[in-house]
């Protein structure tokens, strides 16, 4: 019991559980004895009906769209705190992750196109390496525990949120044909209500969550990635303290253990089970996986580092207080963990053309993401080594 308490008291415990869940999923998905059970679990239908409103999704989509919205709510709360009171409080500091995210999307896409531009079919996957899987990137960072400065974690969060927003916009513009404008209208009204609640000084968290559920449902029905609703709600919940209490900080404290020890491991278990059936190492030499690997492993850190360097040289932004440029470069490597968002974009790009291309894309995504995770973790472990 003592060892268990010590483990859960460690800052690295959440990251360790997430990695174990991901490894377990990979083993189960590729084992003849367990792959059927694993996929049956993910395909289990779960239906929610309130009056004429019906949401009918399988277990995988409920985890990715509903539970992960709670994770993004926590991320939104933490980033807002840093924007208002912490390391991103000045305009020039807040601009830094925005510029970094732009570079982290443009350069990987260009590098992918350098490999695939001549092929009109594989060229459609240009956005695959532009994405970052924020959950796995933070999970790898969490493995380093308390040696990671909080400001570095917040920078990664802010960068990855903007990266995700960029990916959502790319999906909506280039890979989605059936956006529901009526649902987007309902979402806009819900956001307006959240803004009014905030301006009127309403401090009851439950009211924001209730409107947030309406917002989440509208975003889900619109065809846009529903987790966006979590970030939006997080940004509107009041941070300012009154009588020594802050609704945002209180909710952040409540959500943290649920996210670290339940939601993120469940997300990893549901999404890391990529079947490698039909995938061979010989395929690594083809232009599709090579373009993805180059985009994630080289393009991400190169784009983030280059755009950050230009921003500093041109005085368009300042480094977040307490960080170094070298640390930002390593965070850029961790942003090469594209994983679930990259796989999602690959399925949209190639699903209706040639499903076999999705397998080759998965191979590139796995190699690029795992390499980025190992290199980023190892480099940070050396650079953030505690002084003896």
Curated annotation (Swiss-Prot):
Identification of the protein by name: Na(+)/H(+) antiporter NhaA
A Pfam family of this chain: Na_H_antiport_1
Function (record text): Na(+)/H(+) antiporter that extrudes sodium in exchange for external protons.
Keyword Disulfide bond attributed: no
Compartment(s): Cell inner membrane
Membrane topology designation: Multi-pass membrane protein
Periplasmic side: 32-58, 117-122, 177-180, 223, 273-286, 351-357
InterPro entries for this protein: Na/H_antiporter_dom_sf, NhaA
Catalyzed reactions per annotation: Na(+)(in) + 2 H(+)(out) = Na(+)(out) + 2 H(+)(in)
Origin species: Shigella flexneri serotype 5b (strain 8401)
Transmembrane segments: 12-31, 59-80, 97-116, 123-130, 155-176, 181-200, 205-222, 224-236, 254-272, 287-310, 340-350, 358-380
């Amino acid at each position: 019991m003592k060892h268990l308490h010590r483990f859960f008291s460690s800052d690295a415990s959440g990251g360790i559980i997430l990695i174990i869940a991901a490894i377990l999923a990979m083993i189960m998905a590729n084992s003849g004895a367990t792959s059927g059970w694993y996929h049956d679990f993910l395909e289990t239908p779960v239906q929610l009906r309130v009056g004429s409103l019906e949401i009918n999704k399988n277990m995988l989509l409920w985890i990715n769209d509903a539970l992960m919205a709670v994770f993004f709510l926590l991320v939104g709360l933490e980033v807002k705190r840093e924007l208002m009171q912490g390391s991103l409080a000045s305009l020039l500091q807040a601009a830094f992750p925005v510029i970094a995210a732009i570079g982290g999307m443009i350069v990987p896409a260009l590098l992918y196109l350098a490999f695939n531009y001549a092929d009109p079919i594989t060229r459609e996957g240009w956005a695959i390496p532009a994405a970052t899987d924020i959950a796995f990137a933070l999970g790898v960072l969490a493995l380093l525990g308390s040696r990671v400065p909080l400001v570095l974690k917040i920078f990664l969060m802010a960068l990855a949120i903007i990266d995700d927003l960029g990916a959502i916009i790319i999906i909506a513009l280039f890979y989605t044909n059936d956006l529901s404008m009526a649902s987007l209208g309902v979402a806009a009204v819900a956001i307006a209500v959240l803004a009014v609640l905030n301006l009127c000084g309403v401090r009851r968290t439950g009211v924001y969550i209730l409107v947030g559920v309406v917002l989440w449902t509208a975003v889900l029905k619109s065809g846009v990635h529903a987790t966006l609703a979590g970030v939006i709600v997080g940004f509107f919940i009041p941070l300012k303290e009154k009588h020594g209490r802050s609704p945002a900080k209180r909710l952040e404290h409540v959500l943290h253990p649920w996210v670290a020890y339940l939601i993120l491991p469940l997300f990893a278990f549901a999404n890391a089970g990529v079947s490698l059936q039909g995938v061979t190492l010989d395929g690594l030499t083809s232009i599709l996986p090579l373009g993805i690997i180059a985009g994630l492993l080289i393009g991400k850190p190169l784009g983030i580092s280059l755009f950050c360097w230009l921003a500093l040289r041109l005085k368009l932004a300042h480094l977040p207080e307490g960080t170094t440029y070298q640390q930002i470069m390593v965070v850029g490597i961790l942003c090469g963990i594209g994983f679930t968002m990259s796989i999602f974009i690959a399925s949209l790009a190639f699903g209706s053309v040639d499903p076999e291309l999705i397998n080759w894309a998965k191979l590139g995504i796995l190699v690029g993401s795992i390499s980025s995770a190992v290199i980023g973790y190892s480099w940070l472990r050396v650079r953030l080594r505690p002084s003896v």
